[in-house]
Design a protein with these regions (language model features):
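Short, well-ordered alpha-helical packing segments
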Residues: 38, 42, 160, 223-227, ...
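Short, glycine/acidic-rich beta->alpha junctions
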Residues: 33, 105, 151, 218, ...
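C-terminal beta-signal and terminal closure region of outer-membrane beta-barrel proteins
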Residues: 271-277, 337-390
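Gram-negative/organellar outer-membrane beta-barrel architecture
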Residues: 1-170, 174-176, 286, 297, ...
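Short connector loops/turns at beta-strand edges and beta->alpha or beta->beta junctions
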Residues: 6, 133-135, 183-185, 328-332, ...
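C-terminal outer-membrane beta-barrel translocator/porin domains of Gram-negative envelope proteins
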Residues: 1, 138-316, 320, 325-326, ...
């Protein structure tokens, strides 16, 4: 990066070459209701002598909500149209009910370090990340906490092993990641009575007590993800069986101070797109709608997911296209003590993946969910996939 603006025989303009450093600047919006900005820098040769990874990043996002008038207007207009057979004619346009006094803002920074290990073998890697996030809420009804500011200081440690033979279409090998994220146990030394804090939502002190209770978020978060790839036929274009298993648990140091953030948002395509919040980890489960397994009031503090997937490549190389068919199951629980990896919501389906060098990985899946989720069956669902999945 130090030669970003220097010119020589091999380097013209502001396009750096050489050490694989990455500088990323990004912005995303859907118009009025969501904006996101991020910047990051990473290198695989920190210090210039050994293959040590280093990264630093920061981000800011804001999501707003609609005013209560939207729901009232929608109800009365739909009732009027039902009686007289009229259409809405745009009277309930979502954009017309933007409420700047209902929002959740997130600001975060992170510092990361990683190193390849030589034991047990050369495929292992150790990664450590120190991160800070500040949540700023105003009249936000999708969390246990609706108003105020909250802080999250955490340390993540992960060990991964990757031995696949191809990044775009693996035929053999495996991928495993085990991680733990820890915050300081603030409740162990602040001498506060969390059992009797913010328990009565009708109290005039409820919001103030919420702010006091969640000023510093505390939790311990455990995750495991694993994939294996097995070639069932010979040759470059071969039939491949992919198996997947993953699970996560979000625990608390104090049972009266469960974290309202960093829960699991389970169901659907698994992309971290528009949802009721951006302080959740998005987990896909095809055959069910986005977040349908963890609706408001039933936040996910534990989840599991298992998959069997058959893949066959139609085109290999810089542009890769392959089809797939799959069986999948998973579930989510709002209490870690109720975690049962064999109580799954099942689905099956087919799909296709396309990798284009200038675009990245894209996909489309059709899946059918066989089981009921909160009284409704999953049924037929289409899922759009953008980006590489673990």
């Amino acid at each position: 990066m130090r030669n970003l603006f220097n010119k020589n025989k091999e380097h013209r303009g502001i396009m750096p070459i050489g050490d694989g450093e990455v500088l990323s600047l990004g912005a995303q919006t859907n118009g009025t209701y969501y904006q996101s900005y991020n910047a990051s820098y990473s290198t695989n040769w920190f210090g210039g002598k050994r293959p040590i990874q280093f990264s630093v990043g920061a981000y800011f996002s804001k999501q707003t909500d609609v005013s209560s008038n939207y729901y009232n207007s929608s109800y009365y207009n739909n009732y009027y149209n039902y009686l007289y057979g009229y259409g809405n004619y745009g009277y309930n346009n979502y954009e017309n009910y933007y409420d700047p006094d209902k929002y959740v803002k997130l600001f975060g920074m992170s510092l990361g370090w990683g190193k390849r290990l030589r034991w047990p073998d050369d495929y292992f890697q150790l990664s450590v990340q120190l991160a800070y996030t500040r949540y700023m809420l105003k009249n936000w009804r999708y969390f246990l906490m609706t108003n105020g500011n909250s802080n999250n200081l955490n340390l993540s440690i992960s060990i991964s092993r990757t031995s696949t033979d191809n990044q775009l279409f693996p035929r053999r090998g495996s991928e495993f990641v085990a991680s733990v994220t820890l915050t300081p146990p603030w409740s162990s030394w602040d001498h506060k009575d969390y059992k009797n804090l913010a328990t009565n939502s009708q109290s005039s002190l409820y919001e103030r007590e919420q702010q006091e209770k969640y000023r510093w978020v505390e939790y311990h978060k455990w995750k495991f993800k694993g994939k294996t790839y097995t070639a069932l036929t010979s040759g470059q274009k071969c039939l491949v069986l992919m198996t997947r298993v993953e699970f996560g648990l979000l625990g608390s140091y104090n049972k009266y101070k469960k974290s309202p953030f960093e829960t699991y948002y389970v169901g659907g395509d698994g992309m971290s797109g528009y949802s009721t919040s951006y302080a959740e980890e998005t987990i896909g489960l095809r055959g069910y709608e986005n977040g349908s397994l963890t609706p408001y009031g039933y936040e996910g503090y534990a989840y599991d997911r298992m998959s069997l997937e058959l893949r066959y490549p139609f085109l290999l190389g810089n542009t890769t296209i392959y089809g797939l068919t799959f069986l999948e199951g998973g579930n989510a629980w709002n209490d870690t003590n109720k975690f049962n990896p064999f109580n799954m919501k099942r689905s099956a389906g087919i799909g296709v993946r396309i990798f284009l060098p200038m675009v990245g990985l894209m996909g489309l899946d059709w899946a059918y969910g066989f089981d009921k989720v909160f009284g409704t069956r999953g049924g037929s669902n289409f899922h759009f996939i953008l980006g590489q999945e673990f």
